[in-house]
Every structure is written in C-alpha cells, then in structure tokens.
C-alpha cells in the first residue's frame, strides 16, 4: 500500500482505537514494525532543546503520522525521561510515604500532579507506580513502593493510576514481578510457592489491572521460578491476561529482554531500550525459522497502539509547557504533611509551643538537617523545581506564629570526630529545643548494607541525648524502617520520610502543630535485624544454585507483619502504627450478617470519637483471621478508613468486606484449581489501631451453599481439586465446631472424616490429579 497524507485512515479520531491500530499496522512495512517494537537513543525532534543523548523514546515515523513516543520515570514524580538535561518537576514525597497516609484520595492527588506535569512536558508514558513489596527492609528501591501489605499497595496504586491517566498519560505498574531487592536484581531466580505468589506478590498488580485500569505493565529483570520475567508465559499471559483480563501492553525493564521469539510469544510487547533482541536481523531470523509469526508481531504493536490511540497520543501535538510550581508545590506539601508518622511523644512534648521557645538547635548531617530530603536516587530521581530547607521551614513557621526565636544550624560531618560529637552535645544543651534530623536516602542499584542509620548517625543522636535536654525531638527522614538502639532515651520521634521539595515547611508545620500527624506505618519497624523474616541468607541476599543467584521466599506467607504475628515477635513499631496530637476512642465492632456464603458482602460497623482537644485524623483498620486449618498467618489487613474529627466529635464508620473485590479479602489461593476460594469456617474480624493493637473483635462464619451437585463442597456447582482441598482441611471437625462445613459432611453423620474425603475424590472428573 502506498501511503500518502490523504490515505491515513487511522488518523480519524472518530474510529475506535482497536480499528485505528489495525489500519495503521496494515500499512506498515516490516522495517517500520521492527523499529516500533523497541526504544532507541536520540532526542524528540518536536523539542530540540531536549538534545539528542536520550534513551526513553520510540522515534517517530513521519510518513505514517506516528509521533515520537516519549517515556519517563517514575513512581515518585517526573524522573529521568528523554530530555537532557532532565526536566525539573515537583518533588513529591516518596511513594512509601504516600502509603503511610492510608488515604486513596491523597493517592489520586499524588497521581494527578504527576499526570498533569507529564502532559505539560509533552510526555506520553509514565513508568509508575512501583508495585513491588517491601519484603526486605534493606531494599534500595523501597522508597518507590507502597510498603509490605499487598492490599494497601494495591489500593493506593489503584487510586493513583486514574490520577495519572486522566491527563492522557499511560501509567505503568512495575516491576512485574518479584523484583523486590536490588542485590542480583538482574539475574536472580526468585523461588516462591504458588499460593504465596498470588496472595502477596501478584495481588497488588492484579488490583491495579482490575481497579486501576492500568494501561501498561513493566516486566522485570529477574527470573520467576526459572524463566526470566519477560520470557514467562505464565505470568505474562496465563495470569496477567487470562486470569486478570489485562488488555494493555507489556514493556520490558531496560535490558530485561533476554530473547526474541520466546519473549514475544510469552506476552512481552515492547523492548526497552536499545532493541538488541528485537532488532531487524533477529526478528527476520525468527520469522524465517518459524519460531515467530507476523501475527505475533502485529499483536505486540496493536497492544501499544490501542493504548496510544485511546489516550489521544496520536491526536495531540508534542509541546513542552511550564509547570505550575507554586500550585503543585502546595499540593506536594499537603500530601507530605498527611504522610508523617508520630512514633513517640513522651510527655506530649509535641507540638512545640513557639511562645515558650527562644532558641532552637537544628542538628544533623547535611542531607537531612541542611538540605531538603527530596527523594531517592536512580532512574526515578526527580530534579526539584525548588526546595525548602529545614532552616527555612522553621523560620517560616516561627515568623507566621509571631515568634522571634533563633534557629542555629549545626551540620555534622559523615564521619564525626569526638570534637564534632561534643559540639552536638553542647548545642543540644544550650538551646531551649534540640531538633535532631537523621535518616536514609536510598537508591536504585544497591541495597542498604544494614537496617542501621548510615554514616554514624546513631552517634550523633546519642551525643544529643547526652545533653539531657527534655525538649529533644528526633525527626527521621527515611526510605524504610531503621533500627533505633537509642529509642528509649529520645522523648519525641517524628518519621517524616523523604518528604520532597517542601521538606522544611512540612516538618516545621508538623512540629509546631499547624498540622496534626496522621500517618500510619506501611512497614514494620523491628527491634533487631535478627527479628526480620529475611534474616536467613537463602531468603536474602540469596545463594548460588547451579550457577544462578537464587532467592527463596521460604518464609512463604509470613512476610511483613504476618511474620511477626506468626512468630510471636514483638516489633519496635508495628505495621499500621502512628500517634496523634489528640486521642481517639473506638466503640465495639459489629459484623453483619453473622453467616455468609463467601460471596455476599459483610458489613462492619463501629464508632470513632475524638476524645482529645485537637482536631485530627485517625485510621481504624480492619483485619481478618481465618480458621487455623487453612494455613494463613494470624491476620491480614482487608480494609480501613481515614476519619477526620473535631474534638468531641464522633462518627459511625461503615466498611464493607466484599468477597468479590479484586483484593480477595476473605479468600485464599487454591493452587490445584488455580482459583481464589473463600476461606471457610470461623472468620475473626478485628478492629485495630495497628497490626499490634486490636481494639475490638467480632465473628462471622463462612459457610458454602449447597449446589446439589454430589461432591461439590464449595458450592460453585463444579467438582474439582478445590472441593477435595476444602474437605481435607475440615477433617476431624464436628457439627458446631469452627471449621465444620455442612457441605463436606457427605454421609451426614456430623463429623468430617476420611469417608467424606473419599466420597469427594470419587466424584472428581476422570483423570483429575490434585496435589
């Protein structure tokens, strides 16, 4: 077909995206198709100022009106893109901080800032949000992710994605999948059982597909139970498209493509960055030997083009505008203020009373006390449009309060001498208030060597404590949990995370009570490194098996707070924990109906009252615990609500546990049948302040309905391995006991025994094999 400017039917915006993609692909030569299967170095010709030494783009094909496809990181704002030097953008708080807000509406605002700025800068694809689990606290990229709980991560990310995509920007859930550490991230084989895989690590991705409607997925570097993630037909096709119904496209991480035909056939659609495996020579060879078909190439192109047409990328010009730094900076500040977690407040030291303060000593290393902790490093690093330092923030707030207090900054070197530490003690002793700032800024490419604060910061904190100043406040600016050997000696601790460009204003407004802290920990803070679930070398950093670095998730479902619960280990600060400048009282939790078939919603109600003297927000959390025979950890978070109340105000909170939700709140993954199955038997519903503090408990019972089909225990009208699994787990139970399933009592004698299991086994379809 000879294409001219008059014969470009795919440029008709009234046509459906699928039809436009089909028309375009039909007009392309093989050379053009291959050029569009991978990224390339260069610069967007539409924006000459971006230069030519850039990597995140697919070059335009002017004759076909295919625009330059412009890609940018990342999970914490506009990171590295296809402009050199990198475009400055709003430095939001890190993603882990966002998770600490437990507020999906805030996640939407977070995504809206990113989407708005991506559109303003003429970009098309945003490589984020980051969906990996904070399984290992030393993980260098945990700052890009949403914590250790899959439902929290999935809920927050699913709220962020529409914020991004409303601006015609393609969001991308990454890194799919099990890319949970930086050590050997490009080569490791991650070994995990199927149930753990689905219930913990795949679940947040599933939620972003079903709830967030994410348009693209990035497959990761590592191997997944053998095959590389970008070569894996089970994850990329069976699970992602078959089980979840994903219709977008899959892009590789940079250099994560390890094959040509294998990856395309498995379900990868687009290679980043250079096209080593999707080169014309290799594609041609694969077509020639029959390992690859033109239909598969066209499928890969269509998946991306459909999204590009859907998001208007073919129909809008590429221009670079001016970001509204003031408006977006105010949003960034508001978000950061709602993410900080008050860990300790002995004697109600906080908020500080400006009227009683004449001098403040601001102490710490430059990264935390002299500069704004605007975020982590690596490809997601944001170049901030501006920053507010801690000193500037304190001065701004003191001025707004009419205070004339002085703030003296003492910057401590990374290798402090005895004289440096003596100066810390003297400064803390000589001021009305000592504010010590410490923390961790992590980066892609390496994990932390330990959970301890780096660069001798423990010594600085200890030196400040030695001053015996009762008004000593520690502000932590972390990218994950840290060890706190001095915790008992510090009166007040505020976890501010890496709060972004507005660091100084955020922290000062929190310390002086202009904002009441309301964040809750999205990760568990251990007392000791040996308490963590990954203290065994096979679990982290892994061992070499057959010449391949191998990480074994042998803790199985006991990840994060589930580990501490199951092992009976008391953490320093539990998941979901966070104090306030006010107090909240919870009424008893009530659950209706008391019996459910595992498909109908369960309603949870309770009251929350602000019994303090300040307005504030709290996050009551609902966890559920299952019949112990099912083999789950003691409890899992299923839902929550952020509640804002004035002093004395009370609110009736109603939450729904919907078994049909994409989070599968009361189901477990049944590997033999490859499906989610409602957890049968007694269901404990916990109203909690954190994973470590249950306020009230109620109960429900999940009973499968009878379908009338012989051997159908779970009531889905089909007899399969899930039914045999259900009756096996209920063996030994009697009528009236927790875990008894009437539908599993095949002989109706009031006890579930081997005769019932045998009866179910006999009704299985011929040839069925169950593990």
Per-region residue spans from a language model:
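Low-complexity, intrinsically disordered short peptide segments enriched in small/polar/basic residues
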Residues: 1, 588, 599, 605-608, ...
